[in-house]
């Protein structure tokens, strides 16, 4: 459903400015006449990407996959005419900040916000997205280019809190695999949840009382993916099917040596990070359902 205000018609987008596509040639970029933006009368860096609006059905899908709500603080990097921030405010009461380096886009966004009646919920800043503080954001939306997404990735990991959501229209984040990818009328949407940092050595305790068993758990982390081992009594199990989604952790401990008892050694763990400890429930193996807890250190 379209929101009840009109966006300026973009009929000249293919003739008046560069367009963002999956393939942008150097010749196409050079063909654009770019007028430098100014701040306080001083020239600033020109836009890395020239404005092409995200279709409204894609906007709505991006907000839906991120489960945007009035509790969120949404930052749209390269916000163009402000439609993502304004739609979130209009539909969900979300407070939002649009960042764009191009002064005409900022002016247009403010007019659109006023027309939509959401000026009390949204803010538009003329700024370089790479110099923008993202620590208050719980949702970040993007429609940039693959090279810019990859350049932005370290900043997202440095400033966003675990559990924050990132949604990109059209372009991925290099080797940071999306948690979810889908298409809306032929347009790709990529979605990530910022993972907590859980790599390192842990003392893992499964069960309680006389049935408790302790493992030396060692985890390696690549973005949201985990690998590792758990050792107890000289026997080592491998960490399989493991990932981190925000502060939630799931993994399986599996006996990779084979044999008749291997099927009894597949234990499925689900838990959450709370401070410096992991805790949750485990099922499978030869002990049935139980609770588990892990604290930093090997426990040896």
Which residues make up each language-model segment?
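S-adenosyl-L-methionine
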Residues: 37-72, 103-136
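Conserved class I S-adenosyl-L-methionine
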Residues: 71-80
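Glycine-rich SAM-binding Motif I of class I
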Residues: 82-86
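Conserved SAM-binding motif I beta-strand of class I
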Residues: 95-100
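A short SAM/SAH-binding and catalytic strip from SAM-dependent methyltransferases
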Residues: 134-152, 157
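C-terminal substrate-binding/active-site "lid" region of AdoMet-derived donor-dependent transferases
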Residues: 149-199
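Central antiparallel beta-sheet cores of small beta-barrel/beta-sandwich binding domains
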Residues: 198-300
């Amino acid at each position: 459903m379209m929101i009840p205000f009109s966006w300026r018609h973009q009929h000249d987008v293919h003739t008046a400015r560069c367009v963002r596509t999956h393939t942008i040639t150097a010749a196409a970029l050079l063909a654009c006449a770019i007028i430098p933006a100014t701040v306080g009368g001083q020239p600033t860096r020109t836009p890395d990407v020239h404005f092409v609006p995200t279709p409204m059905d894609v906007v709505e899908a991006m907000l839906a996959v991120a489960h945007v709500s009035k509790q969120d603080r949404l930052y749209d990097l390269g916000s163009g005419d402000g439609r993502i921030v304004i739609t979130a405010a209009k539909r969900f009461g979300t407070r939002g900040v649009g960042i764009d380096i191009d002064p005409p886009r900022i002016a247009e966004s403010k007019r659109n916000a006023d027309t939509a009646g959401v000026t009390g919920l949204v803010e538009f800043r003329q700024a370089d997205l790479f110099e923008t503080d993202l620590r208050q954001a719980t949702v970040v939306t993007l429609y940039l280019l693959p090279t810019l997404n990859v350049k932005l990735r370290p900043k997202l990991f440095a400033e966003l809190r675990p559990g924050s959501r990132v949604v990109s229209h059209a372009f991925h984040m290099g080797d940071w695999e999306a948690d979810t990818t889908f298409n809306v009328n032929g347009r790709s949407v990529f979605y990530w949840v910022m993972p907590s940092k859980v790599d390192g050595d842990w003392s893992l305790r499964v069960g309680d009382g006389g049935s408790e068993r302790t493992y030396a758990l060692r985890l390696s982390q690549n973005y949201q993916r985990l690998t590792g081992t758990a050792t107890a009594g000289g026997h080592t199990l491998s960490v399989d099917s493991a990932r981190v989604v925000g502060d939630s952790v799931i993994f399986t401990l599996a006996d990779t040596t084979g044999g008749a008892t291997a099927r009894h050694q597949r234990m499925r763990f689900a838990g959450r990070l709370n401070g410096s400890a992991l805790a949750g429930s485990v099922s499978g193996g030869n002990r049935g359902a139980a609770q588990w807890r892990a604290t930093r250190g090997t426990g040896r």
